[in-house]
Amino acid sequence: MRFKAKCSGCSTEFKAETRKTFGTSIRIHEVMTGHTVKVKQEV
């Protein structure tokens, strides 16, 4: 997986191959929960 992120407010983790789906799912989670998601990008 190219993109990884972890939510600081809960134990949710995000993994995706494409930038678009990755960003969209993170924004939806942030808006719904009010948490902030920290992104770790891997090459």
Curated annotation (Swiss-Prot):
Descriptive protein name: Gene 75 protein
Source organism of the structure: Mycobacterium phage L5 (Mycobacteriophage L5)
Organism taxonomic ancestry: Viruses, Duplodnaviria, Heunggongvirae, Uroviricota, Caudoviricetes
